[in-house]
Amino acid sequence: MFRLAKGKLQTRLRWLLLNLGLLVTPVMISAPVEAAEKIYISYGPIEFSLPIAALEVYATVGKVEPSLAFYAGYVKPEEFKQLRQVLITPIDVTPVAIAQFLYSPQGEIVLQRVGEVIQTKARQPGFYAIRAALIKAAFQPEGLTILNVLQEFPTYGIRINSQRGFEIIDDLSKLIQQTQTAIAAVEQASEQEAAAQTERGLSDLSLDLRQPGSVSYTKQTITFDDLSRRREFPVDLYLPESPREGLAPVIVISHGLGSERKTFEYLAHHLASHGFAVAVPEHPGSNADQIQALLSGLAKEVAPPSEFINRPLDIKLLLDELESSFKGQLNLQQVGVLGQSFGGYTSLALAGGEINFEQLQKDCAPLNEDTLNISLLLQCRAFDLPPQDYQLSDQRIKGAIAINPIASTVLGKSQLSEIQVPLMVVAGSDDTVAPALPEQIQPFTWLTTLQKYLVLLRKGTHFSTLAPSEDDVPLPEAVLGPDPTIAQEYMKALSLAFFQTYIAGKSEYQAYLSAAYAQSLSQELMPLSLLTILEPLVREKAGL
């Protein structure tokens, strides 16, 4: 009977079987009253059940029980073989780490979402049962695996709410389609800009801005202590030994959430070799140490709401201290700032965007349960701050680069439109943390500054521009993108052109801030596009 309707039913059953583990895995405690024996999957009036014991036999000895053989017909043979490995592959996480995350505000939101799909047999949300199963499974000698999460689920059965699951998949498909349409529109507009620039003829573009400069510089680490905020943080300072022309222009680099000063060390060296003084602070409430503290049980959340205030204030204090300590060496009235992710927000706040409590009220009270924008889990933490004007902008900032910024809600249209300094926004088409469409492409259309640039890295992810540290776990291509060195070379060239133009005041570099120059840099593995304006017709085509 089921074989006759194999088309759509087969596709959806296949999705459920292959993604059962993926629905559980991202939300990585309490002794169960009973252990789950079956997984129930409903499809309209039809209900299927799968004994967990059959999965255990298949995972441990490779034998396909009759109750599992039925489902094997709905999955490609190679995928069915992969299922065995997926079930028993341990996930490297400690019980404390998984518990800390699941009890954090962000973890609880993720549990709520997943609990809509993975429920108890009585059709109750799986929030508490999933949390219990994950933590209990992490205590097992073999470590946390999909199989032992299923075995530790503390009710007789696990029910997959297929209707809700398919709704999420449909929403995701729509977002992907909208994003692809917008990206295609951006790339087309960039190609048209490049063609027009080539027709008009460009200035000499003989310089290879990816290459290091010839300026010698020193590196030192200074620790700043802000007594008023009880906050101490280190800063790596790269100083040119002999600035070629008067005071050295200054660039500040702000790292992302869970990162640290070395993330953009490659860019600091590059800019310093071209005569810039570069300051790279480490933000103590949202750096790698903060994440480690969370996973060790020493912190309660990924980043406290106060980080939305403290990060810009770190940089304002840094500039104050440099002004008093390096008078006569640095031009601190013409400063550029570059930031990635949470650092992208930081750079936009310093450039003129204040926390937008009206937008936070709309988007976060409560958080839209259907949103697929993961960055809102962080942005909405700012809603817990007392609503007031924190005066985060700094008049010394004369240009900003925001890479994969998160700002659509915490700053929103009304605040992003207030920024009047030159601005470059960098997006990755495959960014699943701060998705390109809602976080960069759409916000770019809200900008009113006359000097604005949208840079798009096709196949770029949230992590493509980051340099790994020695302690980093190697990440797969799906996370990093095809070749991070390509993205890093792009950032060297474009950030140098931007800061030479708007911070060092060298107008001859403005020609490099063009679609044509980006086209000349572009590589097949990660195509590069740059544009300065999205025409109304292009916006309409992209659904913006």
Regions found by a protein language model. Give the residues of each.
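Short beta-strand/loop motif that positions the catalytic acidic residue
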Residues: 419, 425-427
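N-terminal cap/lid segment of alpha/beta-hydrolase-fold proteins
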Residues: 192-246
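Gly/Ala-rich beta-loop-alpha elbow adjacent to hydrolase catalytic centers
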Residues: 256, 339-347
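Alpha/beta-hydrolase active-site loop
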Residues: 300-332, 349, 359-378, 386
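Cap/lid segment of the alpha/beta-hydrolase catalytic domain
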Residues: 258, 262-265, 270, 282-309, ...
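Mature extracellular/secreted ectodomains of secretory-pathway proteins
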Residues: 48-51, 59-202
